[in-house]
């Protein structure tokens, strides 16, 4: 059984339109996704503005960079603001015990003002 003429023409057309790696335009320059030596996928290079009047753009760029790092599970470039619980945990001593015991031993504001 011989293939039909329209089918042969369609195959010839599709094969002629297919791009080979040699004929595809290559992206020159920086800014694409790449793999580092450990095999991790790295995002595009982020060029931060250096002028003083572009602080807002710089902060936005740093927020985007933090978002990329958060997606990849990497630490943030800006330290996060500590919550009250983190501050209390930082000052809790091991001999005091847990935070519930710590909060019971702290005098209340009204008691201090009365004395």
From Swiss-Prot:
<dbReference type="InterPro" id="IPR008174">
    <property type="entry name" value="Galanin"/>
</dbReference>
<keyword id="KW-0964">Secreted</keyword>
<dbReference type="GO" id="GO:0005179">
    <property type="term" value="F:hormone activity"/>
</dbReference>
<dbReference type="InterPro" id="IPR039244">
    <property type="entry name" value="GALP"/>
</dbReference>
<dbReference type="GO" id="GO:0050829">
    <property type="term" value="P:defense response to Gram-negative bacterium"/>
</dbReference>
<keyword id="KW-0929">Antimicrobial</keyword>
<keyword id="KW-0372">Hormone</keyword>
<keyword id="KW-0527">Neuropeptide</keyword>
<dbReference type="GO" id="GO:0032098">
    <property type="term" value="P:regulation of appetite"/>
</dbReference>
<dbReference type="GO" id="GO:0005576">
    <property type="term" value="C:extracellular region"/>
</dbReference>
<protein>
    <recommendedName>
        <fullName>Galanin-like peptide</fullName>
    </recommendedName>
</protein>
<dbReference type="GO" id="GO:0061844">
    <property type="term" value="P:antimicrobial humoral immune response mediated by antimicrobial peptide"/>
</dbReference>
<feature type="propeptide">
    <location>
        <begin position="86"/>
        <end position="115"/>
    </location>
</feature>
<keyword id="KW-0165">Cleavage on pair of basic residues</keyword>
<dbReference type="GO" id="GO:0007218">
    <property type="term" value="P:neuropeptide signaling pathway"/>
</dbReference>
<dbReference type="Pfam" id="PF01296">
    <property type="entry name" value="Galanin"/>
</dbReference>
<keyword id="KW-0732">Signal</keyword>
<feature type="signal peptide">
    <location>
        <begin position="1"/>
        <end position="23"/>
    </location>
</feature>
<keyword id="KW-0044">Antibiotic</keyword>
<dbReference type="GO" id="GO:0042595">
    <property type="term" value="P:behavioral response to starvation"/>
</dbReference>
<comment type="similarity">
    <text>Belongs to the galanin family.</text>
</comment>
